[in-house]
Structure formats: C-alpha cells, structure tokens
Amino acid sequence: MLASIIGGIFLIKVAYANPLNLPSYALLKPQIKEAYSFAKLEGDKLQDLPCNCGCMSDASSHGGRLHSRGLLDCFIEGDLSNGGKWDSHASECGLCYEDALEAKKLYEQGKTKEEIKEILLEKYSKLKFSEDTVYEE
C-alpha cells in the first residue's frame, strides 16, 4: 500500500513538472526545456527559420532525413498531434536551442519572421565552422 501511495505521488510530481510531456532529454537544462516547449507550443514560428549548425545539409544528424521545415526540424519530426515524434538533435546542439530562444525573444519584441530570419542569417554570416566549434573570422 505504501509503495502504491509513493508511486502515485511520484507520478503526480512528474506530470506536474512536465505538463507538456516533453522527452527526458529536453529536461536536461532549463534553456533546453524552454526551447522544446516553444517548439511544441509555437512550432510555426520556428518553421522556415534557418538552422545554422550545419545539420540541415547532413542527414545523419537527424536519423537519415534532411530538414524541410528549418529550425523546427531540430526539435520535432513531423506533426506531434498526428504521429510525429520528438528529435533529440536540439538538446545536444547549443546553436539550435539558443537560436530558438533568440527567435522567441525577438518575437516577443515584435519582430516578424522575415526580420528574425535576417537576424539569424546575419549572426552567422561572418563566422566559419569547424567540426568542434564556431570561430569568428
């Protein structure tokens, strides 16, 4: 009986701590959780925004599939309400989840999707990428 009560309390705490039913890897850091929450609740705002980590041109980053929807594909494969599933890529890629959070902030400031797209493209236009990190030229 006691184990049943403790188990029930645990389930309530887990459900309360994760009301959006995010995958466990999305809960690793508060910023990652915020980015995955944004992708789930307002994914249309990430659709067509550029992903600048290079994963859009390398299908191996996403289980063999190339991006078709931009930054949104770093978080979600397909439509979650219609058989889609989460993608773990953004939980492991600071560029992806940080750009999603930057986009969220810019939307909150009243920027349009086109303005945000330009800001993200400009942000990386003067940088070069290596296998390990981003360097300023």
Residues of each region from the PLM?
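Local cysteine-cluster metal-coordination motifs and their immediate loop/turn environment
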Residues: 47-61, 75, 90-98
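Extracellular/mature segments of secreted proteins
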Residues: 59-74, 81-86, 102-104
